[in-house]
Amino acid sequence: QKFNPPAMKEKIGEKTKIVVICNPNNPTGTYVPIGELEAFADTLPEDVLLVMDEAYMEFATEPDCCSMVDYMKAHPENPILVLRTFSKYYAMAGLRVGYALGSEELIGIMRKCSASWNLNVCAQKAAE
């Protein structure tokens, strides 16, 4: 199915706290052009966190399939979290090495919730 911003927006209610978009999508490889993503992000309520799962971004070859990192930096007032991984592109699936990009506030919240032992030494060395 194609990304449908109006239909997605219609599903966002008072109880909605997070919207997650995988771009590019796994396993189909389809993607949402950056312009559509930015326009959609502009319409989200201030209290809804947009989580962009960009695990496969390094495989994208289309010029309009771009990361939301620049948008996130340009709009610090919008709660956006971009998730990336080394596991897919660098063939490190067994090591489960990834990272999150977001505001200091969002990253601080994540740190409070994460276990301090969630990454083994082998994975840490591979990420270096």
Regions found by a protein language model. Name each.
Residues K2-E14, P27-L50, Y56-Y89:
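Active-site pre-lysine segment of PLP-dependent enzymes
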Residues C22, C65-C66, C113, C122:
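Generic recognition of cysteine residues
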Residues Q1, P5, C65, S103, ...:
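A structural signal for well-ordered alpha-helical scaffolds and beta->alpha junctions
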Residues V20, V51:
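Walker B beta-strand of ABC/ABC-like P-loop ATPase nucleotide-binding domains
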Residues P79-E128:
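PLP-dependent aminotransferase class I/II
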